[in-house]
Swiss-Prot record:
Pfam families given in the database record: ABC_membrane, ABC_tran
Residue numbers binding ATP: 373-380
Subcellular location: Cell inner membrane
Role played: Involved in lipopolysaccharide (LPS) biosynthesis. Translocates lipid A-core from the inner to the outer leaflet of the inner membrane. Transmembrane domains (TMD) form a pore in the inner membrane and the ATP-binding domain (NBD) is responsible for energy generation.
Name of the protein in its database record: ATP-dependent lipid A-core flippase
GO MF annotation list: ABC-type oligopeptide transporter activity; ATP binding; ATP hydrolysis activity; ATPase-coupled lipid transmembrane transporter activity
Keywords: ATP-binding, Cell inner membrane, Cell membrane, Lipid transport, Membrane, Nucleotide-binding, Translocase, Transmembrane, Transmembrane helix, Transport
Family that this chain belongs to: Belongs to the ABC transporter superfamily. Lipid exporter (TC 3.A.1.106) family.
Entry-linked NCBIfam families: MsbA_lipidA
Broad EC category: translocase
Transmembrane parts of this sequence: 24-44, 63-83, 150-170, 251-271, 275-295
Subunit structure: Homodimer.
SMART domains xrefs: AAA
Gene name as annotated: msbA
Amino acid sequence: MSAPTSRHLYGRLLGYVKPHWRMFALSIVGLILTAATEPMLPALFKPLLDEGFVAKDQDFIRWVPLLLLGLFVLRGVASFISTYSMAWVGSRLVMDLRAAMFDKLMALPTRYFDQNPSGQLIAQLAFNVTQVTQSATSSLTTLVRDTVTVLGLLGYLVWLNWRLTLIVFALVPLTLWVVRVASKRLRGLSRKAQENIGDLTQVVDEAVGGHRVVKLYGGETYEQARFHRAANLARQFEMKRVAANAVYEPVIQFIAAIALAIIVFIAAGQASANTTTVGGFVAFFMAMLLLFAPLKRLTAVNDQLQRGLAASETIFALLDQDAERDTGTREPAHIEGRLAFRDVGLTYPGKQTPALARISLDIAPGETVALVGASGSGKTTLANLVPRFYDPDAGRIELDGVDIRDVKLQSLRGHIALVSQDVVLFNDTLAHNIAYGSKREASPDEIRAACVAAHAWDFIQAMPDGLDTLIGENGMRLSGGQRQRIAIARAILKNAPILILDEATSALDSESERHVQAALETLMQNRTTLVIAHRLSTIERANRIVVLEGGRIVETGAHADLLAKQGRYAQLHALQFSQ
């Protein structure tokens, strides 16, 4: 797939500006007025010299200061209007793009997050969007204002002496060729620089998020080396971009200087031959000099523009991702919780070996089924199919006899609760973490009842602010067992008929595990439960144990029956309890 053109990217960016067209139009008017005052300055000096200093017209000289003041007042007002209006549009553009990106992230399937590092996504939201703003607003300010300025000055030069001005136009094709070559180079370098910023963000995100592991295992030097490598790589690409731009700008300016030198030489000859006035010569020369500043800005804006367009490529690549497919039409208000897997198979993208193969399993309402197997056997993958984090490649999954693909995603997931060892808590109060999402309007009494059932009320009461206690990023102010019980309270409050427990009691001390296990027993009552556990002692009381190996079911039965079979489960059990 070919890369989008600059015109296409800029057109899409301007589409986000369209809702704010009034402020945008106001800024354009201000820019045009500001630019229009530029050629007025040399135009004022021609009659000043010819009429005031040569012809000694005192009446005209007295008007010149007033005209100059009026000119700069007009320029100042127009500049304020354009600057403020464009900044307003730019800030709205940043907000709208970030909102669109975040909304898209919330709608993307799980596989997208599995395939894209969080650091890259954070960099796109935080860094790339501001780069795009430079492209859509700041660059546009320069392009409009300075293009109008250049056109105005060129028009004035044509009016003064069209023959001399033709020299300027003769060098335009060469200038455009240089701009085209530089644009391609700058876009590629800007794209690489932004990718490196994403890598840098990823290193920081991992090192900060895993700071305890880093410190405990003495990984500081390794992480510092990773960061320095990423930072140096980002610096190298940035310097390549700067070097390309540093070469490109002087080349453009040298071309302009050639034109200026030729014009000055010819104009000086005309002045000595009395074919032009002093005022005409000074005005022409002054207008030529005034061309330098906007031309320099126009050549420099290409670097800024290409950085923004390179950033917009990554942003629109995200926005163009297909949202999670929701093929369902049914919204069952109540379900019994009967699950059935019918010849289910799944192969992850880019993998040759299937993660699951021909899985057939019936689970009765209220039954607790434990999924057991070595790492990579397919336990978590199988559980992830129930809420449709992934869809199977083959076969189907039924809920109360209905293919889950026929149930709306929101409705399906509304009937499922999840508690895992990787508890996700938000930097908010305990109450808001428990009454989360669809349960946001739960009453204090309902929240308290869920906390009591989860064996969490005692430690919550001991906190200074109770349920209003802020728990920090991912619940960092809570112990591991407390975090688990908050997650269980959240699941109890949801009161979903299907429950998935993914390693919910691993990595806990004995006291915490006792509390969590008691809370889980309360949670599992009258619910269809899938339990994933490496610690076989935690699932001995399951109604049924399903043993997976290589993505296939190799054994199924109760704990005692499977031990008596002396099969794969007995081997896993013996191996674990011999350690």
